[in-house]
Amino acid sequence: MSAPHETMSFQAEVKQLLHLMIHSLYSNKEIFLRELVSNASDATDKLRFEAIANPSLLENDADLAIRIEADTAARTLKITDNGIGMSRDEAIRNLGTIARSGTKEFFQQLSGDQQKDAALIGQFGVGFYSAFIVADKVTVETRRAGVAADEAVRWESTGDGEFTVDAITRAERGTTITLHMREGEDDFLSAWRLKSIIQKYSDHISLPIRMPKEVWDADTSAYKRTDEWESVNQASALWTRPKSDITDEQYIAFYQHIAHDNEAPLSWTHNRVEGRSEYTQLLYIPARAPFDLWDRNHKHGLKLYVKRVFIMDDAEQLLPSYLRWVKGVIDSADLPLNVSRELLQESRDVKAIREGSTKRVLSMLESLADSEEEAERAKYTTFWQQFGQALKEGLGEDNANQERIAKLLRFASTQNDNAEQSVSLAAYVGRMKEGQDKIYYVTADTWAAAKNSPHLEVFRKKGIEVLLLTDRVDEWMLSFLREFDGKELVSVARGDLDLGSLADEAEKAEQEKAETEWKDVVARAKTVLEGKAKDVRVTLRLTASASCLVSDEGDMSGYLQRLLKQAGQKAPDAQPILELNPEHALVKKLRDLPEGDGFNDRLLVLFDQALLAEGGMLDDPAAYVQRVNKLLA
């Protein structure tokens, strides 16, 4: 006879489960205090809600607060709140059942606006057990608000899978958690250490966290505890206040606090977003780039709070990488965290915050860049000098905002006689010559190299503006920025450069004539430069230089090849095209030279000079010097 169908429960070894949670769930020991303070904060919020319907629960003690007290002699740490407290059944149910959250259960009983107003933090029901990270025994004494003093309860456990519960008498409502510290954890009994943890994680929860006040004792040259209590947290989150109540000085002071920066920020935006994802954002644009802006191993991101409790310092998921320089705070009512609340999990809510924050930052930048006030535009100039190269990364990272980012770009240009990157693409388009349908640019290692590039000669002759691109990221950026306002971006170093209607018929006829006249010389030159140049031809794009190198359509530019090699990356060895200026004296002499060393040496010098002019490196500098010396002799 077959066995009957049964539904059975998984069995868990509670002792092993506790050990796993205590030693594996949290990566940072100090997290225990954040979790216990969060629980205490939840308890006071529960009391506030229940007291709305039943004011007697306050028991003439409406001063809600959390008290933290360390006893170095007894090696204990006490966390006390005068919140809702727990009955015997609640203590057994909430503390004796792992992953059961009383806060979550309470929250589910609220409805409508009550839920929106609730600042309850607990989510998983495991935060309490973080106490065992630093304590080998935990004692909880608690009395629920509204019940008699003799109905209080003591819950105690050593974290071995068992706990005891006793009835006690407790005059005050609320809960006291006493941690009996493990050996080697006395650091968490230091008042200075406790204050620093509180200010890091719980500075902005809505109620005061108090500790015994200490004063300096000159006789003992040490701090001495007094009977007074003092608040050690701000108990107020700036970002939760209405913007109209916050002064510029307060915004600046808060930025300097969270960013550890002595300078004032360039700009900030403060918004509360409501809808499917509810969160508050306070974002700043710094005035100076951090020293580690380009360190990919260093984490960059916003400070993340959930209901005003600090969760993490560098929440990289809340902004794209190209905005990693933004400082600020995101405070969400509900975000998917892992069980230890140390890692943010990707979700639609996280994506919505990232997209919303990105749009806010770009709007800030647009406001500065397009402002009618010179002082605001000057701020954008400062921003661009500090963070412009990082913003360029956005063209490849953020397809949805590509057009907005392109409008914010700034470049040096032949329009100005300096290296300042101040020309926008819109300004360039607005100055284009009649008949011009392309945006022209040149890339080089330095502004001087770009400004003096032989490729610009024909453009100067015709009065056509060319953008001078000298940032290492520019070549990569251009692979994503193919056009702007319907105008194609074209490198002046491309061999198939077509000026369209900007080239008159006489010039085209002259080019065809030169190609015919120099046909034999070009053929000889191709033979000499086989393996070094993909092609040789004459050009009228040069007016002062004898030669230049250009890239064939579809080939990687020489500048980009050099960048990749410098970065240790493999780069295709695309050979350049040598273009000769038939009107230059050095080139004219080629036509008069017979085949042989004289012709070869002069041609190779012209090739090497063109390579040097565009910032390239010679394969054999010594041979180049010898050839030049021959010509000079």
UniProtKB/Swiss-Prot annotation:
It is found in: Cytoplasm. Keywords: ATP-binding, Chaperone, Cytoplasm, Nucleotide-binding, Stress response. CDD domains: HATPase_Hsp90-like. One of its GO terms (cellular component) is cytoplasm. Residues 563-633 are annotated as: C. Gene3D superfamilies: 3.30.230.80, 3.40.50.11260, Heat shock protein 90, C-terminal domain, Histidine kinase-like ATPase, C-terminal domain. Residues 1-341 are annotated as: A. It comes from the Bacteria. InterPro entries: HATPase_C_sf, Heat_shock_protein_90_CS, HSP90_C, Hsp90_fam, Hsp90_N, Ribosomal_Su5_D2-typ_SF. The keyword Magnesium does not apply. Residues 342-562 are annotated as: B. The keyword ATP-binding applies. Molecular chaperone. Has ATPase activity. Homodimer. Belongs to the heat shock protein 90 family. This is Chaperone protein HtpG. It comes from Cupriavidus pinatubonensis (strain JMP 134 / LMG 1197) (Cupriavidus necator (strain JMP 134)). The gene is htpG.
